[in-house]
Amino acid sequence: MNANEEGEGSRYPITDRKTGETKFDRVESRTEKHSEEEKTNGITMDVRNGSSGGLQIPLSQQTAATVCWERFLHVRTIRVLLVENDDCTRYIVTALLRNCSYEVVEASNGIQAWKVLEDLNNHIDIVLTEVIMPYLSGIGLLCKILNHKSRRNIPVIMMSSHDSMGLVFKCLSKGAVDFLVKPIRKNELKILWQHVWRRCQSSSGSGSESGTHQTQKSVKSKSIKKSDQDSGSSDENENGSIGLNASDGSSDGSGAQSSWTKKAVDVDDSPRAVSLWDRVDSTCAQVVHSNPEFPSNQLVAPPAEKETQEHDDKFEDVTMGRDLEISIRRNCDLALEPKDEPLSKTTGIMRQDNSFEKSSSKWKMKVGKGPLDLSSESPSSKQMHEDGGSSFKAMSSHLQDNREPEAPNTHLKTLDTNEASVKISEELMHVEHSSKRHRGTKDDGTLVRDDRNVLRRSEGSAFSRYNPASNANKISGGNLGSTSLQDNNSQDLIKKTEAAYDCHSNMNESLPHNHRSHVGSNNFDMSSTTENNAFTKPGAPKVSSAGSSSVKHSSFQPLPCDHHNNHASYNLVHVAERKKLPPQCGSSNVYNETIEGNNNTVNYSVNGSVSGSGHGSNGPYGSSNGMNAGGMNMGSDNGAGKNGNGDGSGSGSGSGSGNLADENKISQREAALTKFRQKRKERCFRKKVRYQSRKKLAEQRPRVRGQFVRKTAAATDDNDIKNIEDS
């Protein structure tokens, strides 16, 4: 190309590369031509190298006349294709690039830039393009460059004022080598030559392929070791050395797009030469190009011998190593089988379908057509079987110990309540009730205390009455039964209820006379020592007479705590028999329990709200009203029970507030609230009066165009005279 063609358009300067001396002369003239314009735009530069007053500029900041790229590059000049649709931004970035000794080819949009690139006579080293442009965006231009046979080796640098992570990720994943955020800084433009240097090194084969193989064998071993430690600490026996293939399979020189993932592990064990310029802190971003030897959807793992060896050094357990070798398996077992190794070593094995296999050496649970079988070797359970004969206590201790391992995969399904499975439902009710009792209740020394941290939810709400004595000891009882009873089993239930009634009567005879429960004609007491609980049988839904439900005053005398603790076992014997009855209100299949205690006594009521009245109401829709004051509400759910007077408006919250001290606290609280409301009312009244008075005075003031004005002296005198005459 001759000099006339170069001077035709300042936007596309084309230099003849045959004569190097003529090229340098043109660069000098172009630099001197734009020096004044750059000074007017605030870009100070000094190209007077020979003057004594000039600044000492570093080598990379000097003009193209003094910079010799041949000293460390295979090219004499570096030509940058700048693609920017904004004229002002393009002019400033062009000036900065020329000040950094680059030759600039300008383009206003992507189509114009692609025309320049299609002409193979135009030598372009770097493409610096804007992302968002009309006609052809920067990403579209990037795709065209990468799909071209001869231009695919040119490094493309994206720039934009939108620095969102999604846009950056999209550009880098498409194949860009770097992303610059506007406004562009001069220090970022000075290091653009490093991309050209990487291309030269990769094409000549003297260095690494653009930093894709920066990860050495030592880095690989460290990553494997670290991942193994992480997998061991989290008790998930997965292959910790699984990583992504970070090798660059392109042999055509497109190595500047390297890995920038979290785990860059080379599968190939051969050591590779790492160049000094391919450091991790380089400014260019790197993108993964997967190796064709390993598909991207497969996970690459090292041989199992290395992993087993490291785990043997850590655990010294052959079984653990064998489990690690087959860590990802398809089959999943829901059965719980004991293992010989300790529980801490084989807590859970993570499957590929996110299933757990829990193993324990203490217990084995089988749910089938027969009764529930819970076997244990603990001496505490044997002692419990020998002492009281209450087998469900042993079930309670087992269920509390093994509740958390059972949770992920074992679900006790709802059992059908036919004649063949009535016994299973009874034992399940025993286990569920014993597992949900209050942990603070003291038994006769046979129940094993559980020290696990249990999340205890509060039963208080914004609509419940204020009772600090009951709220402090309130524990959620939950749903105490999940099997609904059918009509065809009503006869069996009546028989079992009568048997429980007879057994309870025998127990009352064994107790002292003054602490014996008073049983009416149509109701029976649930082993309460101080209260008369009305609980009717399904076959006789009558309302008993007042004489049958009368209570002697001698039975309300306080008893020692140890005496009541001895009766705790009797209170829990007939829980399942009581649960077999249908719900009294017919609202749901959930049995609501309200456990009220005075001096550690236990009182059971079904779907009832506890009030402070002194009489016990009877009937199928009644509630058990006791004389306990400030008792402990242990398992009350918001049921649908009715009050004792039969009005049907009971809330079932069970707040026992019959104590005189509680009444005093409530009265004090009400008095304080009344006083506060009165003060607030007076304060608001004062503000209202003050506002009204000021408003009245403001209306009386004279105004001129909406502004207040002062009265003149004459007007004031006239008003004074009028006031005197009126008076």
Swiss-Prot record:
Residues 344-353, 467-487, 519-535 have a biased composition (Polar residues). Disruption phenotype: Insensitive to the effect of sucrose on the circadian period. Transmembrane segments: none annotated. Residues 669-711 form the CCT domain. InterPro entries: ARR-like, CCT_domain, CheY-like_superfamily, Sig_transdc_resp-reg_receiver. Disulfide bonds: none annotated. GO terms for molecular function: DNA binding. Residues 1-47, 203-265, 291-312, 339-416, 464-487, 509-560, 606-670 are annotated as: Disordered. Pfam families: CCT, Response_reg. Residues 14-40 have a biased composition (Basic and acidic residues). Residues 246-259, 538-555 have a biased composition (Low complexity). PROSITE patterns: CCT, RESPONSE_REGULATORY. It is found in: Nucleus. Gene3D superfamilies: 3.40.50.2300. Phosphorylated. Phosphorylation varies throughout the diurnal cycle. GO terms for biological process: circadian rhythm; cytokinin-activated signaling pathway; negative regulation of DNA-templated transcription; phosphorelay signal transduction system; red or far-red light signaling pathway; regulation of DNA-templated transcription. The keyword DNA-binding does not apply. Keywords: Biological rhythms, Nucleus, Phosphoprotein, Transcription, Transcription regulation, Two-component regulatory system. Residues 641-657 have a biased composition (Gly residues). Transcriptional repressor of CCA1 and LHY, and positive regulator of LWD1 and LWD2 expression. Represses the expression of other clock proteins and master regulators of plant growth, development and response to abiotic stress. Involved in the positive and negative feedback loops of the circadian clock. Controls photoperiodic flowering response and temperature compensation. Expression of several members of the ARR-like family is controlled by circadian rhythm. Regulated at the level of mRNA maturation and alternative splicing by SKIP. The expression of APRR9, APRR7, and APRR5 requires the presence of LWD1 and/or LWD2, indicating the existence of a positive feedback loop within the circadian clock. Belongs to the ARR-like family. This is Two-component response regulator-like APRR7. It comes from Arabidopsis thaliana (Mouse-ear cress). The lineage of its organism: Eukaryota, Viridiplantae, Streptophyta, Embryophyta, Tracheophyta. The gene is APRR7.
